[in-house]
């Protein structure tokens, strides 16, 4: 059994732990770790579930050059992940709804996780892929490469209750899907991102993005994340919003907002208010009750109040 402990000094409410099964390469490197029942808080005195030990009795997998080990992992949620098993526990917490996005430290996770070939017989180290393919054919074992990535499909590790997922390849482990969420076939949810309530997702929810209850992400819609382009701002969408088909945002939306189909509103987009004033969209970030549209004759982006509400600028941006 392997044990990973990142901190003994973290407070109980900022710790998590779990018994898991690690896939270990013959050179000692860990490919992945599955935690059937991750827990928050300090670990209890329980021993590893018997079923986990039963899995390890199968011994070495000659096709993949791996074996499984029972691991006991205890982590500090405020510290950065230190190894593969630590990182996988954090991703399990998110997809198991034990932590919401942006509440646990994932700094450096890309450097910790290995890039695996995820196949129908489990993860395989990239250097072993072609040999494993040949060995599988010799053994007449069905063999399909599903994806090559550092992050696996969520449903191969965690299946949250009360959700629908049209294409499992498009939801990464570490996604947070609340009860009542539907991710259609063209939808996508990254790790450390997701929904907090009932939502229809037909577009892309990027890393770090949080979507509120009753909000729909239209087909082909895009929400800027923090993984590409060096962006630091994390986008939050409030309750009861609609991001139209092929629309996109690089600012946060409050509650009851609509971005019309095909309109992409970035932080620097010039927006004309009902009183004729022109502001950067960033000054409206987080504001509620706004309809964003583009005038089809002039191309001007306009913001209109919804439900008899006046548009209010983000006051934080005007404090010196």
Swiss-Prot record:
UniProt-annotated location(s): Cytoplasm
Lineage: superkingdom: Bacteria
InterPro entries xref list: DapD_actinobacteria (IPR019875), Hexapep (IPR001451), THDPS_M (IPR032784), THDPS_M_sf (IPR038361), Trimer_LpxA-like_sf (IPR011004), Type2_DapD (IPR026586)
Keyword presence, Magnesium: yes
Binding residues annotated for succinyl-CoA, in chain numbering: 204, 219, 222, 245, 260-261, 268, 280
Example of a GO MF term: 2,3,4,5-tetrahydropyridine-2,6-dicarboxylate N-succinyltransferase activity
Record SUPFAM superfamilies: Trimeric LpxA-like enzymes
EC numbers: 2.3.1.117
Catalytic activity: (S)-2,3,4,5-tetrahydrodipicolinate + succinyl-CoA + H2O = (S)-2-succinylamino-6-oxoheptanedioate + CoA
Protein name: 2,3,4,5-tetrahydropyridine-2,6-dicarboxylate N-succinyltransferase
Organism field: Cutibacterium acnes (strain DSM 16379 / KPA171202)
Highest classification ranks of the organism: Bacteria, Bacillati, Actinomycetota, Actinomycetes, Propionibacteriales
